[in-house]
Amino acid sequence: MELIILVGIAIALLVVIITLYLLQKKNAAPETKPAAAPQRGVPQRAQEGVPRRAQIARNQRNRLRQNAPAAPAGQVAPAAGAPAARGDSDHEDEGQVDADDARVPQGAVLDEKMGAKKRAKMEAKEQKRLQREQELHDREQRKVKEAKEEAERKQQEDLEAEVERKRVEAERLAKEERERKEHEEYLKMKAAFSVEEEGFEEGDADEQDSLLAGFIQYIRDNKVVVLEDLAVAFKLKTQQVIDRIQELQADGTLTGVIDDRGKFIYVSEEELSAVAKFIKQRGRVSITELAESSNNLINLTPISAGGEEASS
């Protein structure tokens, strides 16, 4: 679009220049036209453009002066001064013409004025064009900068998202691995417990009963036992001890609870009955009152085997 505008401006400028050149050449033609050669048989004044009527009048005056007698001295002066007066009038006419010519601006001056206006207009257009180009350049640079910043921001977001995804994936894999190991450990302990049970079945029945009785008595005597210590005492694994205690609780051989600290608290049937009787008598009991009463109703002090037999 800008190229078409520039081509149109160039064509218009060329037309103006050609027009000015033709006008200047036309105005300068009368000044530079060579003088024509004088025609033969034509008076000098006629060749110089003097009117024919004036020439005839001058000829008549000349003949009258030749045929007339000599005039008085006072009358001769005016006759002699007449041509001079006409000559002065001719000079005045020529001076007036020269003054008129001086008042008319010549072609070069006219072309210079018109050229200055045109040049100022062209310079203004050129300045606007350069300004538009600079604005377009700045706009393009700004777009490029914004696109670069957007690409960098998107790249940073993608990088952060990838890091977060890897972190979540690592946590998930670690959790799965931990659960898998725990499950494998559980299966191993379960298999070992099954082997121990099979060994008991294959062994002597009296020995099995003795070991089981010792296991139960150890818990009753100590009242509060650490499961790991119990496993070491009977050469079992901790999970095997937990499974055996749960089995004994299920068949009613042992009564108690396993807390979250890895301990089993044994409570006898008599102690449970005393606690139940206390709750029934009081009706509604708070946890604080129950805890205070349980310390009196439930004995958590380890007792010896002899003491247990005496009490029984």
Curated annotation (Swiss-Prot):
For this entry, list what GO says about its biological process.
Answer: protein ufmylation
What membrane topology was assigned to this protein in its record?
Single-pass membrane protein
The record's subcellular locations are: Endoplasmic reticulum membrane
Which keywords does UniProt give here? Endoplasmic reticulum, Membrane, Transmembrane, Transmembrane helix, Ubl conjugation pathway
Residue segments, region Disordered: 30-163
Q: Where is the composition biased (Acidic residues)?
A: 90-99
Its main subcellular localisation, reduced to a broad class, is endoplasmic reticulum
Segments passing through the bilayer: 3-23
What is said about its interaction partners and assembly?
A: Interacts with Atg9; the interaction is transient.
Query: Under what name is this protein listed?
Result: DDRGK domain-containing protein 1
Per the UniProt record, the source organism is: Drosophila erecta
